[in-house]
């Protein structure tokens, strides 16, 4: 959950979790909230921006035989949508990851956060980097084009439910 002083708006929730995502692996600061909050503030002020999809797409292309969710290597990985198409997400590579048969059959067209946290009972902070990066970028884009970034939002699992 974001720090108490992070506003409960869609944009803030997305920026906070994106800051956690980019800070953790690059510097080994997974729990260093000072760096996370600094990055969040820089995103919010426009000093820095979320990267485009290239980084995630390259990682997916390099690991077509590895499940993006469980890390299992398999020659039978299938493309799976990170965000359900039923939410109006335009088709494209930016919404696909490779998944082993078990994860693909389990996730299907479910929301990533609901599937990961509610069904698999996994901690929100352990969603793998590539699917979470895509999820956050798609959430930001979809909420921006639907003028929903300033709507109230209490959790990451609500960012797509604010789109009307």
Model-assigned labels for residue ranges:
Residues 66-98, 104-123:
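Histidine-centered nuclease catalytic patch
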Residues 16-66, 124-151, 155-156:
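Short, charged surface segments at domain edges that flank catalytic/cofactor-binding sites
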Residues 2-4, 26, 100-103:
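Short, charged low-complexity linear motifs
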Residues 160:
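Flexible, polar/acidic helix-loop-strand segments at domain edges
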Residues 2-12, 18:
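Short helix-coil boundary/hinge micro-motifs
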Residues 100, 108-109, 128-133:
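Short C-terminal domain-edge/linker segments immediately following a structured domain
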Residues 163-164:
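C-terminal, charged low-complexity interaction regions
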Residues 1-2, 67:
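Residue-level detector of intrinsically disordered, flexible termini
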């Amino acid at each position: 959950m974001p720090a108490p002083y992070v506003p409960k708006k869609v944009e803030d929730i997305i920026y906070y979790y994106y800051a956690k995502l980019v800070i953790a692996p690059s510097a080994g600061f997974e729990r260093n909230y000072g760096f996370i909050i600094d990055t969040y503030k820089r995103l919010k002020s426009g000093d820095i921006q979320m990267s485009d999809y290239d980084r995630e797409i390259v990682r997916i292309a390099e690991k077509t035989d590895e499940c993006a969710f469980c890390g299992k290597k398999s020659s039978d990985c299938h493309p799976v949508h990170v965000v359900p198409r039923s939410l109006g997400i335009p088709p494209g590579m930016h919404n696909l990851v490779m998944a082993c048969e078990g994860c693909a059959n389990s996730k299907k067209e479910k929301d990533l956060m609901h599937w990961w946290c509610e069904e698999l009972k996994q901690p929100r902070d352990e969603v793998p980097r590539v699917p979470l990066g895509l999820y956050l970028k798609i959430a930001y884009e979809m909420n921006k084009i639907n003028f929903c970034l300033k709507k109230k939002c209490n959790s990451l699992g609500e960012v797509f439910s604010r789109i009307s």
